[in-house]
Amino acid sequence: MSAEILDGKSLALKIKEELKKEVQDLKNQGINPCLAVVLVGENKSSQKYVSFKEKTCKELDIQSLVFKLPENTEETSLIKLIDELNENSQVNGILIQLPLPKHLNQNKVLERINPFKDVDGFTPFCLGRLLIDSPLFIPCTPKGIIRMLDEYKINLEGKQAVVIGRSIIVGKPLSLLLLKRNATVTMCHSKTINLQDITKKADILCVAIGREKFITSNMIKKGAVVIDIGINVTASGKVVGDVNFDDVKEKASYITPVPGGVGPMTIAMLMENAIYAAKLQKRVVK
């Protein structure tokens, strides 16, 4: 029997409809949410993600400001722009599209963002708040994954959760959120030995390694919940995940497709964070 599909696309549409009403309520109070997105360089994937974010802002009537900077932008220039956006009271959220060109210090750049405008949740302040179970902004992809698991009433308490990938974007914050739900979490990465022995014990397997169709059915146990966070483009131009979907779906109980799983939820959570930032700064919430 094939796995049930965790339909992130449909859930994201439902969430966006609710957010659209929230935006209208804020506008009725004279509050106009505004998200600033900074893109440095010519990375094609980054350009595509930024266009998705612009499009979704437009759908929800959130103002978006996109700053496209050349590949050779100096760090001082980027920091100066962030400082200006921090000071601009009309801008509620600031997002630096990652990855940055290699000559830029990602940590230094992210640290410069005002934590109360850090809608990606990547500043040391926001990550620290997440660590002590008092989050301000939760990184969008992990937040979307947990929301999806909740929607499908997938219980995490006492379950063995395996996360492959240790970035601050997905792996580390997702592990913290799973721990918060009382899962027993194992984090794996490129140096993990005997990976298959670990993945086969997972009740919940979350994969974010950037390797096309890497996870196969012989690497999971029957009935596992499989969350595919990978986005890879094949030689033919097809978008696929880190999981061999057609193979694994015959053994898993639930699985996310790529596209249409985690990706749409990430964008929806970004919009939710942007709206929350506007409320926070205008003191609609505390």
Swiss-Prot record:
One of its GO terms (biological process) is methionine biosynthetic process. It comes from the Bacteria. CDD domains: NAD_bind_m-THF_DH_Cyclohyd (cd01080). Pfam families: THF_DHG_CYH (PF00763), THF_DHG_CYH_C (PF02882). GO terms for molecular function: methenyltetrahydrofolate cyclohydrolase activity; methylenetetrahydrofolate dehydrogenase (NADP+) activity. GO terms for cellular component: cytosol. NADP(+) binds at G165, R166, S167, S190, I231. Keywords: Amino-acid biosynthesis, Histidine biosynthesis, Hydrolase, Methionine biosynthesis, Multifunctional enzyme, NADP, One-carbon metabolism, Oxidoreductase, Purine biosynthesis. It catalyses: (6R)-5,10-methylene-5,6,7,8-tetrahydrofolate + NADP(+) = (6R)-5,10-methenyltetrahydrofolate + NADPH; (6R)-5,10-methenyltetrahydrofolate + H2O = (6R)-10-formyltetrahydrofolate + H(+). Belongs to the tetrahydrofolate dehydrogenase/cyclohydrolase family. Catalyzes the oxidation of 5,10-methylenetetrahydrofolate to 5,10-methenyltetrahydrofolate and then the hydrolysis of 5,10-methenyltetrahydrofolate to 10-formyltetrahydrofolate. Homodimer. This is Bifunctional protein FolD. The lineage of its organism: Bacteria, Pseudomonadati, Nitrospirota, Thermodesulfovibrionia, Thermodesulfovibrionales. The gene is folD.
